[in-house]
């Protein structure tokens, strides 16, 4: 317990990783899949009606031609892949969660959709002049550190054909992330563990960096404790333009979200469509 207190008493260094991977944990990934598929909540994926509106906007704004090849980075259970494939586009989805991909493959087979799903880390993308468009939805871009974002943008640029577009969304610099802490206990099957466990959660903010961290310490009945971290970089328009330009992109569209809501300086989220130069 003393060691755990000492670990949690310190503020983590920016983008310091957690003590275990979150997305590949077998139990957590199954619970995450359930959250993705819950139509009543935006906890992991957006609600079906929102996804439908986003896909409408993306098809128009990305100027996708019939049969265009599209890459979905961090595709999860394939909700966007399925919606786009049903419209006649050729989809490839990449995700690190085996549970989500197993569901996505089964759903595609049952629907007769020829989606290609790849099990892997999208940060290791290695394709060349392949896609007309790429997607990275639900703020995944801001989870990555500065070097990882820069490297990923270069890889996406390389994977796109000349003039190809990249659409993604992020949390805005206008969003407020106050520091807080809370705890919860479960005697049975919970999100983090299948047996009894305690969860100590806190949000740490670094306002000078427009960065925050959600930290979860999961304590099992044996006393074993594991700390998980999810980082969230917040972005201004200027920062986005700078990072995109460094990787060979031009910012074409900036909205408040992927349904095309007009952007204002008070918007808490930003959606971007950038074109490969």
What are these regions (language model features)?
Residues 150-162:
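A short glycine-rich, Lys/Arg-flanked "PGG" loop and its adjoining helix->strand segment in the class I
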Residues 48-66:
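Conserved alpha-helix/loop element of class I SAM-dependent methyltransferases that forms part
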Residues 77-89:
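Conserved SAM-binding loop of SAM-dependent methyltransferases across substrates and taxa
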Residues 126-133:
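A short acidic, Gly/Pro-enriched loop at the edge of an enzyme's catalytic core
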Residues 167-242:
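SAM-dependent methyltransferase
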Residues 97-99:
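Conserved SAM/SAH-binding beta-strand->alpha-helix loop
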Residues 1-23:
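N-terminal auxiliary segments of SAM/dcSAM-dependent transferases
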Residues 111-123:
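Conserved SAM-binding strand-loop segment of SAM-dependent methyltransferases
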